[in-house]
Amino acid sequence: MVNDTISDMLTRIRNANLAKKTSVSLPKTKVHEKMCQILEQEGFIKTFSFSETNTNELIVDLKYQDFASFGNYGVGKPCITNLKRISKPGLRIYTNSREIPKVLGGMGILILSTSKGLMTDRQARKLCLGGEILCSVW
């Protein structure tokens, strides 16, 4: 059994990207669904769907850059360069809306857990909300 499901999710996506997989399966939780929804909106993954065979499984279709520019080598570079867990079970990291850091000068995103649910750093700044910084994606 996994104690930190968010770290497990990020590790599964990272490993699937490195192995050039087209999709990866995750345990279905509300947090995973919302994080996948954010990653899809920001353009880091193609889509996510629920498994038809297993009701407790979430299927994430990974997104790669156009492989036509890479010749006949198959899949191009992954859209997700790095996934990093920030707040961990042993060391929680919180921030207010004025001190939310930018990832790579705004090129990446932070996913925050706020009182209004999970959202990106841009949405949290716009709504003047702080919260726990779950992870960074770029």
Curated annotation (Swiss-Prot):
GO cellular component, one term: ribonucleoprotein complex
Cell compartment(s), UniProt: Plastid, Chloroplast
Keyword Plastid tagged: yes
Alphabetized SUPFAM superfamilies for the sequence: Ribosomal protein S8 (SSF56047)
Gene Ontology molecular function terms on file: rRNA binding; structural constituent of ribosome
Family affiliation: Belongs to the universal ribosomal protein uS8 family.
Function of the molecule: One of the primary rRNA binding proteins, it binds directly to 16S rRNA central domain where it helps coordinate assembly of the platform of the 30S subunit.
Record-linked HAMAP family: Ribosomal_uS8_B
Protein name as annotated: Small ribosomal subunit protein uS8c
Protein species of origin: Chlorella vulgaris
Taxonomic placement: Eukaryota, Viridiplantae, Chlorophyta, core chlorophytes, Trebouxiophyceae
Gene name, Swiss-Prot/TrEMBL: rps8
